[in-house]
């Protein structure tokens, strides 16, 4: 297992913990003009060479900020980890006890009416990684074919003006 440095103090500790737990070796990012040894890799984030390496790796674990309770300074600090993918896209049936214990929020009923759909375009890094430079334009065009609701574009960070929304479209 080769654990790739992030070159950032706050996230380097995550790489170090993964390396310790897997008996992995911490390495610098391998540039595109160098061959990557056939091995398992661990990456945190897609910046500073990790994204390019992930595209070339045969087998890897990818970690990034969690969807719930994200943040390096929270106790406990939560992250998402995937195998050979940027996000987990398989729907699986799991017992709900861990969700209820750690993240519980009352889910509201699915809405089929409303006036606004929020589209959250990718950040520059995600747009680069997925080569999705036309994602926003394509998504809005597709939505307009299926709805007459107002479409609101919300860049990061969260826009407090968008309080009442009825649908959300994101890249990941």
Task: Give the label of every model feature segment.
Residues 1-17, 21, 43, 114-129:
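Short hydrophobic beta-strand segments
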Residues 5-6, 136-171:
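Catalytic donor nucleotide-activated moiety binding site of glycosyltransferases and closely related
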Residues 25-74:
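Extended catalytic core of nucleotide-activated donor transferases of GT-like folds
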Residues 42-46, 63, 120-122, 153-156, ...:
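Short His-Asn-centered micro-motif
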Residues 49-53, 69-72, 125-129, 159-163:
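Short catalytic/ligand-binding loop motif for oxyanion handling, primarily in non-cytosolic enzymes
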Residues 58-59, 63-129:
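A nucleotide-sugar donor-handling region in carbohydrate enzymes
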Residues 127-132, 154:
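A short secondary-structure junction signal
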């Amino acid at each position: 297992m080769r654990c790739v440095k992030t070159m950032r103090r706050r996230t380097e500790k995550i790489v170090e913990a993964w390396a310790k737990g897997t008996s992995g070796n911490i390495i610098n990012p391998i540039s595109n003009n160098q061959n990557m040894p056939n091995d398992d890799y661990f990456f945190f984030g897609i910046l500073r060479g990790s994204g390019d390496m992930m595209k070339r790796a045969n087998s890897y674990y990818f970690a990034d900020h969690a969807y719930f309770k994200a943040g390096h300074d929270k106790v406990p600090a939560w992250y998402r980890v995937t195998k050979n993918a940027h996000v987990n896209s398989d729907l699986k049936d799991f017992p709900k006890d861990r969700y209820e214990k750690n993240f519980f929020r009352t889910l509201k009923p699915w809405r089929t009416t409303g006036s606004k759909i929020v589209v959250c375009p990718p950040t520059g890094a995600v747009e680069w990684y997925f080569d999705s430079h036309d994602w926003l334009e394509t998504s809005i065009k597709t939505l307009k074919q299926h709805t007459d609701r107002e479409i609101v574009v919300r860049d990061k960070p969260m826009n407090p003006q968008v309080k009442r929304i009825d649908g959300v479209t994101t890249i990941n």
